[in-house]
């Protein structure tokens, strides 16, 4: 199951987020997991993807300080959320605060997961990094062809 596209949405007054219909149709009647992401985002995964992803983290050595830190930051900031009958999820307050989300969000399909960004934060991220995209793409592409 692949998620793709960028969608502009708003939280309602009860801090619920409507999942875009193209994404929602892929995850109806299932549980999803919302976690602290990277660069100020949140990440949403299906149960199957969350189990794969979290097992990779949890299989790292707990004797390593960085492993403990990333486990604390991500796994401890993950919540199992239900999708209601009309395709909304309630994002817990602590995650909204971590991502500086108040109302307006972008929902980004990222293949195996969905990123949820505060719109201003994502716009700033894009502006700060747009000049580097070609350079990064070249570096990654060269690494794939070795």
Curated annotation (Swiss-Prot):
Entry GO CC: cytoplasm; nucleoid
One of the GO biological process terms: negative regulation of DNA-templated transcription initiation
Transcription regulation listed as a keyword: yes
UniProt xrefs under PROSITE patterns: SPOVT_ABRB (PS51740)
Keyword Transcription regulation: yes
Domain SpoVT-AbrB residues, every copy: 6-49, 78-121
Subunit record text: Forms oligomers.
Name this protein carries in UniProt: Transcriptional regulator MraZ
Protein source organism: Mesoplasma florum (strain ATCC 33453 / NBRC 100688 / NCTC 11704 / L1)
Source taxonomy: Bacteria, Bacillati, Mycoplasmatota, Mollicutes, Entomoplasmatales
């Amino acid at each position: 199951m692949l998620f793709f596209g960028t969608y502009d949405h708003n939280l309602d007054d009860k801090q619920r987020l409507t999942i875009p219909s193209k994404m929602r149709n892929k995850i109806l009647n299932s549980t999803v997991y919302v976690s602290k992401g990277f660069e100020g985002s949140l990440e949403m995964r299906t149960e199957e993807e969350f189990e794969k992803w979290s097992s990779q983290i949890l299989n790292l050595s707990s004797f390593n300080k960085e492993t403990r830190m990333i486990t604390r930051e991500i796994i401890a900031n993950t919540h199992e959320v239900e999708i209601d009958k009309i395709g909304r999820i309630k994002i817990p307050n602590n995650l909204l605060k971590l991502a500086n989300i108040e109302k307006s969000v972008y929902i980004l399909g990222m293949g195996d997961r969905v990123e949820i960004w505060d719109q201003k934060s994502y716009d700033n991220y894009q502006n700060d990094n747009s000049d580097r995209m070609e350079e990064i793409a070249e570096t990654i592409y060269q690494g794939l062809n070795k």
